[in-house]
From Swiss-Prot:
GO molecular function: metal ion binding; peptide deformylase activity
Catalytic residues as annotated in Swiss-Prot or TrEMBL: 134
Classification via SUPFAM superfamilies: Peptide deformylase
Gene: def
Any GO BP: co-translational protein modification
EC number: 3.5.1.88
InterPro entries cross-referenced by the UniProt entry: Peptide_deformylase, Peptide_deformylase_sf
Protein name per the record: Peptide deformylase
Swiss-Prot/TrEMBL cofactor(s): Fe(2+)
Length: 169
């Protein structure tokens, strides 16, 4: 298992549309394990494969306080959305920045688990928001895309400055 490098904006690889996973095999399971290691190391609650430069439809999520409720979504499909909500979202690809993003309050999805078995899931609250956020990554969309151009520019400038400071350290 390994911690992978998380891409940061303005990296254009974050805009790539992920391809469906053709077969859930040992290689995909290794990617899932590495993604969980990376997500936990970065103190995130969700990670899409796109964020670690793997352009396949794979998401890992754990919104639990004790980090013991791993959720794997391979080839996720949105079946239903209901209601309206929003929280200040953050993103491992947009470090130390947060913004209020409109989301559906409840979602119903279909996906494959880490063993390739299909399942459906209904979610609300933080889990529903996280699922929507990570599914956006699979189509090259970031939470800042929901913001005004001015807010997008300010966030990009802050992240670029932060990355410059980190690269000097």
């Amino acid at each position: 298992m390994a911690v992978l490098q998380v891409l940061h904006i303005p990296d254009e690889r974050l805009r790539k549309v992920a391809e469906p996973v053709k077969e859930v095999n040992a290689e995909i399971q290794r990617i899932v394990d590495d993604m969980f290691d990376t997500m936990y190391a970065e103190e995130g609650i969700g990670l899409a494969a796109t964020q670690v430069d793997i352009h396949q439809r794979i998401i890992v999520i754990d919104v639990s306080e004790n980090r013991e409720e791993q959720l794997v979504l391979i080839n996720p499909e949105m079946l239903e959305k209901d209601g309206e909500t929003g929280i200040e979202e953050g993103c491992l690809s947009i470090p130390e920045q947060r913004a209020l993003v409109p989301r559906a309050e409840k979602v119903k999805i279909r996906a494959l688990d880490r063993d390739g078995k299909p399942f459906e899931l209904e979610a609300d609250g933080l889990l529903a928001i996280c699922i929507q956020h990570e599914m956006d990554h699979l189509v090259g969309k970031l939470f800042i895309d929901y913001l005004s151009p001015l807010k997008q520019q300010r966030i990009r400038q802050k992240v670029e400055k932060l990355d410059r400071l980190r690269s000097r350290a």
